[in-house]
Amino acid sequence: MAVIFSSSALGSHTHVDRHLVRQPIRDLENNVDMLDHLSRVLALSSQYHALGAAIALFACACAYALVAPRQPPKFPAPQLYDETGPIDLIALDKTIKEGFQNYKGKYFTLKEAHGETVILPTKFMEELKALPDNMLNLDDEIDERFLSEYSLFTTTSVGGRISTVVNSIKNELTKTLGNLMGDIHEEVVYSFQELIPPCDDWTELDIQSKLVHIVALVSGRIFVGLPMSRNQEYLDCIIEFTLNVFFAVPEIRAYPRLLRWTSRYLNTKVRAVHKSLATMRRLMAPIIDDTKQQLEMGTGPHNMCAWNIKNSNQKERDSLNIQAQMQLATSMAAIHTTSMTVTNAIFDLAARPEYLQPLRDEFQDLRAIEPLPYLDKTSMPKLRKLDSFLKESHRLSPISLLNMRRKIVQPITLHDGTVLQPGMHIAFPLHQISNDEDLWENPSQFDGFRFQKLRDLPGNESKYQFTATGTNNLDFGHGVHACPGRFFAANEIKMILVHLIDNFDFKFKGDIGRPDSLWTPGGYHPDPSVRVLLKRRLKA
């Protein structure tokens, strides 16, 4: 309790004990000293907190600097935006078309989710098409765009090399394709028997879902072989992995960069992807062990599993994780692109039934000349009308809007003096090239036999095929960077379509015309909600 004494009060009470007066004054002085000490402690404490916060902020900045990709210098070209800001590859065709028309023959850039992409004019294609991976790299581009470290999109995510799978496709799959046509045909017939109902009358089907499972069966026959390729758990695993990976990528990207590692534990799609890898490891373990033993004895099956082991380095060969992921990644690529390409072709045929009979006649005429139980590698290229129809369908409904995507690894000087700096992403405008009025007559009009007529011109026999690549044919890339699996995919697609066209009539439910495709990050996808009616043909 504070006591205040006035001088008048002290003067009027001459007998007051002086000790009683001094004690409260000492207490007051002590309290003031304590308050002063406490104030100094609090000030020092706040300084420590500020210092700690500064250190923590500095540590976070250092950590971000370590994980953040190095940004190349800004490319000196117009950058396109939509009404809401930088575009993110959703509903992108209009924006790319604007850039292609306004800057034709020049550079422009797109601000994508993974960074800036420089869109190159086709005049630079020839000088880039043969450059090696240590100058412009596909693996790095894919890993950044699809966040492979977290999504398991590529084999690099588990310590493997994409080149191992590429070598298996180039050196084994493509070269032995002629010996595999019987297996492909057998699996197409089996898959239709298992997955397509009798269709004695018009039957409504979710055709895209059916095709995903048909392609999974046919591809699995070549990738892992019987009996595993028909194992339901294996089929569910590769299909679920394919779907979950593409859904997972944008969800992972929504995480702060420093926290993306947590998506493995917090995100249901990412957890599902890792679960698929664990399932594939379990399913493939005995097959891989058995295949290794056969290869050591100089034998072994003719499938992608064996070829991947054969082309692996020691680290990859010894890793069940890497071998399992190779199986998933290869299956994903096949299921995703092949099923959508076949679906688009079916939609185009259902919308234009006048093409069905000429395609059937071509197949029947060939079968009369070459009475084989199935189309082989030499007879398949003779279906020129079917080849043309597929190419036209792919021209107007591409899987991707951009192609020949790469990341620059070393400085590249183009013939006009422009330097592409390391870290830059590049691409060519596939869809706009395929619809360029300077290249194609009536490009917006569907002409199923457009490319057959072009091939009939002198000197064009080997040009304009479905699998052909070139400056104006970028569906499968070009040069050393062309898709290595396009020959297998083309034969698989044609085998499925021939079986469907030969055995079924089909149409849309109602007079709806050709359904619009859906825009998704990077390209056109056929609308999965569209249903098709099938009816089995009565053949003599």
Swiss-Prot record:
GO terms for cellular component: membrane. It is a single-pass membrane protein. Heme binds at C483. Belongs to the cytochrome P450 family. Induction: Expression and the subsequent production of PR-toxin take place under static culture conditions (oxygen limited), whereas no expression of the PR-toxin genes occurs under the strongly aerated conditions required for optimal penicillin production. There is a negative control of the transcription of the PR-toxin genes by the penicillin biosynthesis gene product(s), or by a regulatory peptide encoded by a small ORF inside the penicillin gene cluster. GO terms for molecular function: heme binding; iron ion binding; monooxygenase activity; oxidoreductase activity, acting on paired donors, with incorporation or reduction of molecular oxygen. This is Cytochrome P450 monooxygenase prx8. The gene is prx8. The lineage of its organism: Eukaryota, Fungi, Dikarya, Ascomycota, Pezizomycotina. It is found in: Membrane. Glycans are attached at N460. Its main location: membrane. Cytochrome P450 monooxygenase; part of the gene cluster that mediates the biosynthesis of PR-toxin, a bicyclic sesquiterpene belonging to the eremophilane class and acting as a mycotoxin. The first step of the pathway is catalyzed by the aristolochene synthase which performs the cyclization of trans,trans-farnesyl diphosphate (FPP) to the bicyclic sesquiterpene aristolochene. Following the formation of aristolochene, the non-oxygenated aristolochene is converted to the trioxygenated intermediate eremofortin B, via 7-epi-neopetasone. Keywords: Glycoprotein, Heme, Iron, Membrane, Metal-binding, Monooxygenase, Oxidoreductase, Transmembrane, Transmembrane helix. GO terms for biological process: mycotoxin biosynthetic process. Coiled coil: none annotated. Pathway: Sesquiterpene biosynthesis. Its cofactor is heme. Its EC number is 1.-.-.-. It is an enzyme of class 1 (oxidoreductase). The chain crosses the membrane at residues 50-68.
